[in-house]
């Protein structure tokens, strides 16, 4: 495998070209990219956990250090001012020397407010990208050049196309997440609580709760019907029926986002439904290719959901086509088939049709779909279908012309299991689709 250093060198060359093109298009001289700052809890001296600006970590794998600055002009070596205070109260990261530092000029910044004296004197044509606009104004950046929409749209659009360095980082994140999922399944099988399963996951991935790319969803039994369940009960339920784990990992700032669902018993209807959702998810991925709209795959999976609802006699006496047409599949899979993945879990530009930011919204019938792009080589996406038994979504169907088609007795029997979601992370290539998750043998 090519070394991370050589992949990073090519990655920086790609980012430099994107920067050159964006600066030329929007008539700017350079971009000043801010890692961010710590923000204190209201009426307290304790800060929220630091989350780095994703446009900053696109350039350098520095994810834990506030008050850093990057100056890029697309021509000269990117210049990184790395925050290096004298501080005996807090941990101070040393000046980095790593695989990437040959391609970036790294300069120590001893004081957070010292950046002003180090920047070029003429700043009227510098764009600022970061979370603290008032800091940019203090530095003399023109208000119109603070987070300029055109520049950000341009950079976001091309972030959809991962470099080989980015794909290498994402494959490493997959390995970490897969280790976590295996540890979590073992913890579930041994009867642990959601809280303790989460600890097992974090231990296996080497993450803290604040390091994972999103809050882990560790859902036992009916909690699996809450799409973003993050409560973490300390007590294990008296009866273990099901376990849905939606949890990822991060490597050099790049995310993995995986979901698996397990049945406590292997001989019930729910266990068979888990197997069938898994099989249909793999079958859909096998059909994926460049040049097709992501929306099409979402619609196709609703057809697959209809097939499963019919097979398991959850919906009866209705064709699969009629189920989809009348949206009887909707309450069972209320979210989209997936989303772009990268520096952010719900990565940017899912609706962007070109580098000018042209927006194509999700279909009115499926408003929660997070991507309407035509698939192209270099894109990374999640494929995460599910079937859930959510009373608030099912309740409107208990009356009306379609109520008779719902097998309410079967639905009531499945509700204590919550739901099912199976999620893999895939890379679109010219002639194939790479399933990074299954390549690591995560069943």
From Swiss-Prot:
**Which CDD domains does the record cross-reference, listed alphabetically?**
Prolidase (cd01087)
Q: What is its EC number?
A: 3.4.13.9
Q: Which keywords does UniProt give here?
A: Dipeptidase, Hydrolase, Manganese, Metal-binding, Metalloprotease, Protease
Indicate what this protein is called per its UniProt record. Xaa-Pro dipeptidase
| Swiss-Prot/TrEMBL cofactor(s) | Mn(2+)
Extract the SUPFAM superfamilies matched here: Creatinase/aminopeptidase
PROSITE patterns given for it?
Answer: PROLINE_PEPTIDASE
Kindly give the PANTHER family that the UniProt entry links to this protein.
Answer: XAA-PRO AMINOPEPTIDASE 3, XAA-PRO DIPEPTIDASE
Q: Which GO terms describe its biological process?
A: proteolysis
Give the gene name: pepQ
- Catalysed reactions, semicolon-separated: Xaa-L-Pro dipeptide + H2O = an L-alpha-amino acid + L-proline
Quick one: signal sequence residues? none
Question: Which annotated residues bind Mn(2+) 2?
Answer: 246, 257, 423
Q: Which Pfam families match?
A: PepQ_N, Peptidase_M24
């Amino acid at each position: 495998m090519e070394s991370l250093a050589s992949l990073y060198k090519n990655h920086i060359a790609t980012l430099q070209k994107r920067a050159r093109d964006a600066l030329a298009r929007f008539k700017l001289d350079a971009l000043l990219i801010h890692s961010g700052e710590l923000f204190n809890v209201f009426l307290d001296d304790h800060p929220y956990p630091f989350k780095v600006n994703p446009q900053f970590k696109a350039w350098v794998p520095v994810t834990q250090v506030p008050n850093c600055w990057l100056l890029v002009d697309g021509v000269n070596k990117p210049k990184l001012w790395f925050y290096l205070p004298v501080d005996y109260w807090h941990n101070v990261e040393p000046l980095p020397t790593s695989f990437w530092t040959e391609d970036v000029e790294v300069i120590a910044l001893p004081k957070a407010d010292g950046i002003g004296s180090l920047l070029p004197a003429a700043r009227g044509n510098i764009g600022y990208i970061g979370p603290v606009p008032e800091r940019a104004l203090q530095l003399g950046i023109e208000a119109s050049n603070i987070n300029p929409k055109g520049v950000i749209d341009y950079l976001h659009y091309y972030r959809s196309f991962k470099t080989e360095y980015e794909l290498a980082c994402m494959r490493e994140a997959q390995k970490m997440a897969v280790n976590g999922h295996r540890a979590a399944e073992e913890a579930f099988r041994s009867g642990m609580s959601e809280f303790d399963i989460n600890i097992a996951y974090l231990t296996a991935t080497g993450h803290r709760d604040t390091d994972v790319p999103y809050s882990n969803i560790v859902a036992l039994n009916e909690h699996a019907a809450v799409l973003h369940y993050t409560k973490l009960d300390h007590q294990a339920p008296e009866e273990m029926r099901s376990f849905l784990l939606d949890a990822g990992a991060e490597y050099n700032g790049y995310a993995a986002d995986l979901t698996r669902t397990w049945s406590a018993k292997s001989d019930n209807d729910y266990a068979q439904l888990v197997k069938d959702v898994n099989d249909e998810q793999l079958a859909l991925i096998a059909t994926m290719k460049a040049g097709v709209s992501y929306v099409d795959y979402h619609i196709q999976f609703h057809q697959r959901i209809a097939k499963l609802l019919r097979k398991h006699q959850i919906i009866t006496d209705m064709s699969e086509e009629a189920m989809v047409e009348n949206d009887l599949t909707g309450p069972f899979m209320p979210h989209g088939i997936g989303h772009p993945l990268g520096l952010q879990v719900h990565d940017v530009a899912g609706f962007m049709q070109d580098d000018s930011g042209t927006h194509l919204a999700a279909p009115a019938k499926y408003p929660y779909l997070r991507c309407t792009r035509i698939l192209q080589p270099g894109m990374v996406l999640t494929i995460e279908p599910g079937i859930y038994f959510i009373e608030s979504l099912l309740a409107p169907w208990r009356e009306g012309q379609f109520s008779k088609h719902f097998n309410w007795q079967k639905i009531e029997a499945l509700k204590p299991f919550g739901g099912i979601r199976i999620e893999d992370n895939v890379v679109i290539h010219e002639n194939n689709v790479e399933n990074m998750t299954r390549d690591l043998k995560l069943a």
